[in-house]
Amino acid sequence: MAKSIPKIGSRKTGRIGSRKHPRKIPKGVIYIQASFNNTIVTVTDVRGRVISWSSAGSCGFKGTRRGTPFAAQTAAGNAIQTVVEQGMQRAEVRIKGPGLGRDAALRAIYRSGILLKVIRDVTPLPHNGCRAPKKRRV
């Protein structure tokens, strides 16, 4: 009986040509998504390919602590650390959401030494779109 030839990139053979090897990335875009419950920081190159990401939940914060400014600062630091090692020097920051971690994550990015070209707020605002949910009564 003939042996079957394993497919390239199948689960058994592992990934061939993966993008995990470090690349030189001088410029990039940092996305901060800050909700009331969590903060997610994603770093991409100029073309939009994700280089690294981190969230308050992936940094070990659970429950309501994920929405704190300290958790956002830790998440931003973790996401930026791998990118600085790959040689990123300049970045554009896009912040989305009303959360408490907006400023803390931005401060952590400042401290990393990356030059920020533009800081843009891309929070979606409705122009009187859908009806808002009813107010909570506690």
From Swiss-Prot:
- Can you say where in the cell this protein is located? Plastid, Chloroplast
Superkingdom, taxonomy of origin: Eukaryota
Q: Which Gene3D superfamilies match?
A: Ribosomal protein S11 (3.30.420.80)
Positions with biased composition (Basic residues): 9-21
Please, one GO biological process term? translation
- GO cellular component terms listed in the entry, alphabetical order: chloroplast; ribonucleoprotein complex; ribosome
Region annotation (Disordered) ranges: 1-21
Assembly, per entry: Part of the 30S ribosomal subunit.
Mind telling me what this protein is named? Small ribosomal subunit protein uS11c
Q: Which organism is it from?
A: Pisum sativum (Garden pea)
Traced from the root, the source organism's taxonomic lineage reads: Eukaryota, Viridiplantae, Streptophyta, Embryophyta, Tracheophyta
